């Protein structure tokens, strides 16, 4: 997926990281899994949102890429 295919908030954050306004995290996969875990564990969110986050996290964990 390319940044231009993402929502406005992601594109804005991407630009802020690229411009030095926000910090770059070299362990991006770890950061993503932690974020998906936070979303999946939040019982206040709709079940379908939590399941999508869990699916994304599980796929990242099963991938052969390591941070």
UniProtKB/Swiss-Prot annotation:
Pfam name, any one: UPF0253
Stored InterPro entries: UPF0253
Entry similarity comment: Belongs to the UPF0253 family.
Name of the protein this chain belongs to: UPF0253 protein PBPRA2947
Organism: Photobacterium profundum (strain SS9)
Lineage of the organism: Bacteria, Pseudomonadati, Pseudomonadota, Gammaproteobacteria, Vibrionales
């Amino acid at each position: 997926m390319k940044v231009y295919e993402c929502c406005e908030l992601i594109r804005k954050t991407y630009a802020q990281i690229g411009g030095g306004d926000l910090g770059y995290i070299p362990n991006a996969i770890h950061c993503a899994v932690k974020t998906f875990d936070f979303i999946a564990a939040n019982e206040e969110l709709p079940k379908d949102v939590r399941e999508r986050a869990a699916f994304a996290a599980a796929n990242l964990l099963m991938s052969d890429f390591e941070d």
